[in-house]
């Protein structure tokens, strides 16, 4: 089963390679474990901290923030139907690391910036 969020991560990969201002604003790294409806998981790493920004499935890279979230909840955030802080407060997003840095996820998942049709 493909994850609906894959299209979002592919778009983030494109943006992080071209939008140097966004990378500078975010300045941190995330490991996101996405859980599918079938119980399978997929890991994505977003590194907007290193000199060479990276988005992909290299789970060995060191990160500052670790996030666990269901694919459907991640899509709701990307679509603007739920804010990342709401997901955290409702227990839909588990977080390990600095919460202030984790809130920079808003910049990456800004629904106004995402082109993918959800």
Swiss-Prot record:
GO terms for cellular component: cytosol. This is Non-specific lipid-transfer protein-like 1. Keywords: Lipid-binding, Transport. Disulfide bonds: none annotated. Residues 5-113 form the SCP2 domain. It comes from Caenorhabditis elegans. Pfam families: SCP2. InterPro entries: SCP2_sterol-bd_dom (IPR003033), SCP2_sterol-bd_dom_sf (IPR036527). GO terms for molecular function: lipid binding. SUPFAM superfamilies: SCP-like (SSF55718).
